[in-house]
């Protein structure tokens, strides 16, 4: 038994060491990273925090935002999720902040690859490929922690789905229910919603395989188990989901009482304004950042004066101007950094397109292309308009460029499949 799980234990220990090493020495010196969104959230919750300290009761209303709004939209807290919160701490091995984030990112993708039957050493490499793409550390620096944690729980959720379709119904159902519950508790529904498309692609691949092998009853049985598991995971967070749903009707995500007509119409029948949805759209040419990180300059927060290549040809007379200009020159209003998966990983992905066989390869290819094109947003409006108008809930979310997290997931996954074939 010990011999069988020893490679997995070694991988987990390696992930802990890697996570500590990445944040060294800050993780042992008690340094605190300034994160804009985290600081803004702390400010918004200060009134509710002071009320709790004075009375010992949690208020469900604050005047700190938008002239007054429910606190459960700022920092949801429900007694029903307390067991989940403790389970989450155990899963994170009670590691310190930031170290725990990197650890669960590594571990989640490792679990997924092991569900596919990938050897432990190769699954460990896959976890590193996934975790150390640029986007996740940009999320940490910006303070988008809920989004980060939600994304960390998505690979093990899909691992449960894979196990179920591979015939391990009990293990697959438990894993799916558990990580769906953690995922929704992390409170970034947009990321969970986007990965429903990935799940559809993967389920489609297993359906095709079942059709070819005449094992459709087994496929539908696994699908039924997964549906029950999903309902259990959702039910564990029903309080938060219900309150979010009811409150959303009174916000800009609900149906507008004022309707524009004619060419000026930008408002969807219900949901966000089209311009607001697509304001952060990845440029078509900007897609090259998957291969070349600074193809569009890099970060908006980095001044042009810090670019050695640009300064070699710059006129020194305009030095103060260069300090105020960003390095980024893409189509988004601003960005903290590019979506970069790594040249080596992308090479393996392309290799996988040729040497990996079976419907799962086409599912991953389709999901990759799908996410890239949808991330273009206002730069490819025919498809974007179709999704806004006809795909349920798509118009509830803004910053369509963030759907590129799908490509960040599928590219290293197919890359590891390619390495297994080599």
Where are the regions a protein language model picked out?
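Alpha-helical transmembrane segments of polytopic integral membrane proteins
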Residues: 106-110, 154, 158, 238-241, ...
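Start-transfer (signal-anchor) and selected internal transmembrane alpha helices
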Residues: 1-24, 221-230, 350
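Membrane-interface coil-to-helix junctions
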Residues: 18-112, 116, 128-151, 265-268, ...
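Membrane-interface helix-loop-helix junctions at transmembrane boundaries of multi-pass membrane enzymes
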Residues: 4, 211-224, 308-322, 348-378
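Membrane-embedded alpha-helical segments of multi-pass membrane proteins
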Residues: 100-104, 148-156, 196-197, 341-344, ...
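Polar, glycine-rich mid-to-C-terminal structural blocks
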Residues: 221-282
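Membrane-embedded helix bundles of polyisoprenyl
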Residues: 108-115, 121-209, 222-244
């Amino acid at each position: 038994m010990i011999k069988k799980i020893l490679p997995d234990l070694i991988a987990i220990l390696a992930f802990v060491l890697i996570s500590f090493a990445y944040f060294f020495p800050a993780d042992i010196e008690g340094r605190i990273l300034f994160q804009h969104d985290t600081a803004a959230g702390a400010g918004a919750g200060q009134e509710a925090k002071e009320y709790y300290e004075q009375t010992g009761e949690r208020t469900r209303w604050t005047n700190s935002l938008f002239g007054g709004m429910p606190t459960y939209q700022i920092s949801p807290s429900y007694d029903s999720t307390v067991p989940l919160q403790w389970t989450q701490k155990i899963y994170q091995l009670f590691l310190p902040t930031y170290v725990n984030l990197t650890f669960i990112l590594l571990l989640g993708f490792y679990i997924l690859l092991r569900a596919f039957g990938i050897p432990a050493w190769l699954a460990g490499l896959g976890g590193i490929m996934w975790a150390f793409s640029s986007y996740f550390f940009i999320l940490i620096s910006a303070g988008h922690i809920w989004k980060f944690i939600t994304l960390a729980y998505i690979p093990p959720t899909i691992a449960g789905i894979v196990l179920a379709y591979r015939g391990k119904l009990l293990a697959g159902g438990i894993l799916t229910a558990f990580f769906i519950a953690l995922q929704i508790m992390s409170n970034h529904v947009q990321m969970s919603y986007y990965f429903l498309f990935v799940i559809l692609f993967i389920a489609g691949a297993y359906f095709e395989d079942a059709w070819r092998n005449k094992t459709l009853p087994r496929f539908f049985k696994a699908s039924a188990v997964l549906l029950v598991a999903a309902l259990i995971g959702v039910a564990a967070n029903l309080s938060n989901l219900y309150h979010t749903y009811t409150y959303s009707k009174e916000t800009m995500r609900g149906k507008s009482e004022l309707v524009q007509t004619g060419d000026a119409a930008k408002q969807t029948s219900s949901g966000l304004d089209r311009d607001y949805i697509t304001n952060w759209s990845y440029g078509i040419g900007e897609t090259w950042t998957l291969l070349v990180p600074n193809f569009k300059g890099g970060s908006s927060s980095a001044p042009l004066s810090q670019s050695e290549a640009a300064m070699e040809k710059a006129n020194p007379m305009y030095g103060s101007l260069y300090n105020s200009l960003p390095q980024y020159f893409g189509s988004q209003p601003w960005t903290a950094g590019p979506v970069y998966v790594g040249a080596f990983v992308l090479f393996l992905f392309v290799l996988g397109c040729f040497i990996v066989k079976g419907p799962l390869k086409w599912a991953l290819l389709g999901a990759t292309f799908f996410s890239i094109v949808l991330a273009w947003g206002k730069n490819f409006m025919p498809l974007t308009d179709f999704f806004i108008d006809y795909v349920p809930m798509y118009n509830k979310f803004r910053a369509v460029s963030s759907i590129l997290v799908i490509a960040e997931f599928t590219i290293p996954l197919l890359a590891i499949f390619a390495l297994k074939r080599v």
